[in-house]
Amino acid sequence: MRDLRDPSAQDDMRVDIALQGPASTEILLKLAGLDADKAAVAGLPWAGITHVTLGGYDLIISRTGYTGERVAYELFVHPDKAAALFHELVELGATPCGLAARDSLRIEAGLPLYGHELAGPLGMGPADAGFGNYVKLWKPFFVGKKAHIQREMQRESIVVRFRLNNRGVRPPHQGDPLVDTKGRTVGIVTSCSIDSEGYQLGQAYVKADYAKRDTQLAVFSGSARMKANPNETAFGKKYTLPDVVTVLSRFPARRKK
């Protein structure tokens, strides 16, 4: 195994360009190349990987991504060629996308991020995030088996997706509390962004009793900046009011390719 990000890899060095979305195959195949290489890309199954030359670029291409898109690629190219490849893909129709946009897609897809829905201040494991089926307890060499089972026997919460009911409200941040209709804290926001319709959409770690779809909760957005108790504030002072949220299905309906 080699670290292809390390300069010691020399000509084999690689950096990653993510090309995601319904038009990504069409854009990728606009690059000049042999029919065999294009066929390898066009026939790539999910999580498949191939090594081809397209547009004169030596590429390792995987059918992967972290945006929830069914059509998605990651292009591993030498760092000296990355900028040229990026600009050529844009000229062929790709739209540049920053990390915030990518994160909004991740959250909408219900995918966990290390430090938010995995590990982080709440010490969450794969099952907390809804990915417990990836933990292979049948493997005899899994040294964390006992600890995982013990944790699962005690776990009372799980990650959910939620959406604020109104637009134009203060965005929740990691660590903001979720409360039930009686004002009891039942969860903690782990991630939040804005969806394609202008609503704040996020993920939170909540008590299992409140994880059911369409459950109504409220979030104290910006709780770290909350003002004093309203009974202790003078006229004209402001304090944070909770915004109502709706719990969504753990993952969105799977889109066809």
What are the functions of these language-model segments?
Residues 1-257:
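Conserved, structured C-terminal
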